Amino acid sequence: SLGLYLAESLGPDPRMAEIIVERVQSLGLSNETESPTNEERGPTGVLVVKAGTKNQYDDCLWFQDLGRMVENRLGLGYAVAVAQSHYGDPTVDDAATRLVEERGVARIVVVPYLFFPGLILKRNILGGMDRIAQSHPTVSLSVTPPLGVDDRIVAVAADRIRQVWDRVEG
């Protein structure tokens, strides 16, 4: 008989957080935490955006955990929020507004939590950035490349598969 087994998601894995941090750092933005002007500018906002889901069971708690991991790794001078590109909460607009109004950011780096560029990136994420620019015209916006192909993602996926086999064979 054929058995179907569900593995855990990539979820809030430190390796995934590390990739996101590298995407932010790849832009070469200076984090001026020691600069006297930083008080006026506030921290750099990082908005990690995943594909939206209509799944009623995806409460995005795992994604919020991942966002906290990223903020802890980036350290002082950064404020991280997470959002869904469409269909669900938190929305790109709401998360960006929280970064600006509650965390005081003057710059937002958007990190697409996607494996490759495509329709979701073009229509939903970049479209969301257009809305952010209209709502918050003084906020500087930039976007990193998607996660792409990375050995750490492969390692996380392999770990999830091994966990399933361990349960099945154990």
Predicted regions and their residues:
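Extended amphipathic ligand-handling, pore-lining, and cofactor/metal-binding catalytic surfaces
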Residues: 1-170
